[in-house]
From Swiss-Prot:
InterPro entries: Lysidine-tRNA-synth_C (IPR012796), Rossmann-like_a/b/a_fold (IPR014729), TilS/TtcA_N (IPR011063), tRNA_Ile_lys_synt (IPR012094), tRNA_Ile_lys_synt_N (IPR012795), tRNA_Ile_lys_synt_subst-bd (IPR015262)
Biological role: Ligates lysine onto the cytidine present at position 34 of the AUA codon-specific tRNA(Ile) that contains the anticodon CAU, in an ATP-dependent manner. Cytidine is converted to lysidine, thus changing the amino acid specificity of the tRNA from methionine to isoleucine.
Major place of residence: cytoplasm
UniProt-recorded name of the protein: tRNA(Ile)-lysidine synthase
Positions annotated to bind ATP: S35, G36, G37, V38, D39, S40
Native source organism of the sequence: Nitrosomonas europaea (strain ATCC 19718 / CIP 103999 / KCTC 2705 / NBRC 14298)
Subcellular localization: Cytoplasm
Written domain comment of the UniProt record: The N-terminal region contains the highly conserved SGGXDS motif, predicted to be a P-loop motif involved in ATP binding.
């Protein structure tokens, strides 16, 4: 884009429209993260300029962190602004508490993003601009970040895995000075956060103490450093493409082959692991922790179990295959649940659904269950099972081990009991004593993990 000194408000409008049109489509729902500061006020003003012609559904969200004594006034300002523009606004009030070794800025950002995840929108619009991007680059340099971190903030990214809502920063290539010019030209009002002057925060110290000196020596530093973030973004994209190639060669049914990972050169192994973690949108580990994960993976025996927690993710390895599982969603063994003939039985503690259907020549003999108490529960130990009538009854533990199921899967498989007799084991089969005779209609049970929200009970 042109040098910031030559940009007029009209050019800013054109630049914003270009950024917007390149990403959104008619009918998209856009929610502005509105703090009340000049950046987000200008973003909302620009967006309302084009919302009707582009057929966009615009709303706003304000998060009151409760950190400043003025936070209530800022909420009232945002409400008044949105009322004047006929823009729906949702206000969320929080109490932010400091955590050891974490900045207040990072804690507040995490809290905001948790709220954003529940917004009914296609995009959450953020008002970060070119100066913010340059500051982020310098702060990342001071932290010793790699290529991914030095590419700073992406213009667009998914907010969380498996969802469609995205974060969008349409002002990222526009300097702060021109945003201020636009606000003054259009007579906009905004609030000022007094904490922006507190130089105990690294970003504020950089903004007020360091960058003015840098500008004296290199007036165009914003433009040149912003260009560096773009170059680094391209390099990060190429590293992601390399990781995708390595992933294709090392992934086995969505699990990472330990042997395949070990065959890679150390730099490529680090790149692949970093990429797979980033795909799950967690806070990436620093280089020391990443090296420790790889060291342990390189030293364990293929038959050994491995567990390592990174942010909200748990890395587990079993029989040479590495899985990435949400640490807070690993199910616990369940208490007995009585089945009363439902077609769908939700097992919330196991995060899945049992589906019961009738089919010819297969399944459980319904007559064996008639008049009996049928329950679903997890293993308690000592169960014996005979899914193959040509083989003797054996311990369920041994059968599950032979099926190469990971220990954390074995302990949370749903089992169907008729009174005290084990009838069916998910993924294994039906006990001989309960299998349907040929020519009859049987009850087929199927286990569908992670489908709680996809079915209704009958």
């Amino acid at each position: 884009m042109a040098d910031s000194k030559s940009i007029s408000p009209t050019d800013i409008t054109d630049c914003f429209f270009h950024n917007l049109r390149a990403q959104v489509r008619p009918g998209d729902r856009l929610t502005v993260a509105l703090s009340g500061g000049v950046d987000s006020v200008v973003l909302l003003h620009l967006l309302t300029t084009f919302s009707e012609s582009m057929q966009l559904e615009v709303s706003a969200v304000h998060v009151e962190h409760g950190i400043s004594t003025y936070s209530g006034e800022w909420s009232a300002f945002c409400q008044s602004l949105c009322d004047s523009l006929a823009i729906p606004l949702s206000i969320h009030r929080l109490k932010i508490r400091r955590r050891p070794q974490e900045s207040l800025e990072a804690i507040a950002r995490e809290a905001r993003y948790q709220i954003f995840k529940h917004i009914q929108a296609d995009y959450v619009m953020l008002a970060q601009h070119q100066d913010d991007q340059v500051e982020t680059l310098i702060l990342q340099l001071l932290r010793g970040a790699g290529v991914k971190g030095l590419s700073a903030m992406p213009t667009v990214r998914l907010l969380e895995p498996g969802k469609t809502i995205r974060l969008f920063r349409p002002l990222l290539n526009i300097p702060r000075s021109e945003i201020l010019n636009y606000a003054r030209l259009h007579g906009l009002s905004w609030v000022t956060d007094e904490s922006n002057l507190d130089t105990s925060y690294d970003r504020n110290f950089l903004r007020h103490q360091i960058l003015p000196l840098l500008e004296q020596r290199s007036p165009a530093y914003r433009k040149t450093l912003f260009r560096s973030t773009q170059h680094l973004g391209e390099a990060a994209h190429l590293l992601d493409e390399l990781a995708e190639i390595d992933a294709e060669n090392t992934l086995v049914t969505n699990r990472l082959s330990l042997q395949g990972l070990r065959k890679l050169e150390p730099a490529r192994a680090r790149n692949l692991l970093r990429y797979l973690l980033a795909q799950r949108l967690i806070r990436l580990p620093n280089s020391t922790k990443l090296e420790e994960i790889l060291r342990q993976l390189n030293n364990i025996q293929p038959d050994n179990h491995f567990r390592f927690i990174v942010d909200t993710l748990e890395i587990r390895c079993h029989r040479g295959l590495i899985e990435f599982l949400p640490a807070d969603s690993l199910p616990e063994p369940i208490a007995p649940v009585v089945w009363q003939g439902e077609q769908h039985l939700v097992i919330e503690s196991l995060q899945g659904v049992l589906k019961f259907t009738r089919q010819n020549n297969m399944g459980i003999d319904p007559a064996r269950l008639s008049g009996q108490i049928v329950t679903i529960r997890s293993r308690s130990g000592g169960e014996r099972f005979q899914p193959d009538c040509k083989r003797p009854r054996r311990s369920l533990k041994k059968i599950l081990q032979e099926a190469a199921l990971a220990p954390w899967v074995r302990n949370t498989l749903p089992l169907l009991f008729c009174e005290d007799q084990l009838v069916w084991v998910a993924g294994i089969g039906i006990d001989c004593n309960f299998q349907i005779s040929e020519g009859s209609t049987g009850l087929v049970v199927a286990w569908h993990p992670s489908q709680i929200n996809q079915v209704s009970t009958h």
